[in-house]
């Protein structure tokens, strides 16, 4: 299941996102890359982290550098 989700994200990155003339995501790494890394690191639990990131990626967010945490948690680090 994780592999299928990762393949879908890569398809999005290479097919849809690459066609956009400008960057849309407010964060680094991008939301799709964050979801991909979260899935690879935490398996299906990574969906929760990636979904939380997608909810935070909106016009009123400051954005910035927000890497996948080393340990699975929903608490803010820093």
From Swiss-Prot:
Subcellular location(s) of the protein: Cell membrane
Annotated membrane topology: Peripheral membrane protein
Keywords, comma-separated and alphabetical: Cell membrane, Membrane
Pfam families, sorted: YidD (PF01809)
GO cellular component: plasma membrane
Signal peptide: none
Family: Belongs to the UPF0161 family.
Entry function: Could be involved in insertion of integral membrane proteins into the membrane.
PANTHER family, alphabetized: MEMBRANE PROTEIN INSERTION EFFICIENCY FACTOR-RELATED (PTHR33383:SF1)
Protein name, UniProt field: Putative membrane protein insertion efficiency factor
């Amino acid at each position: 299941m994780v592999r299928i989700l990762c393949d879908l994200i890569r398809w999005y990155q290479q097919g849809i996102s690459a066609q956009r003339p400008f960057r849309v995501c407010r964060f680094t790494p991008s939301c799709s890359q964050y979801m991909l890394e979260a899935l690879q690191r935490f398996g299906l639990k990574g969906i929760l982290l990636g979904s939380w990131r997608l909810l935070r990626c909106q016009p009123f967010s400051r954005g910035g550098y927000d890497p996948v945490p080393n340990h699975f948690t929903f608490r803010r680090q820093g």
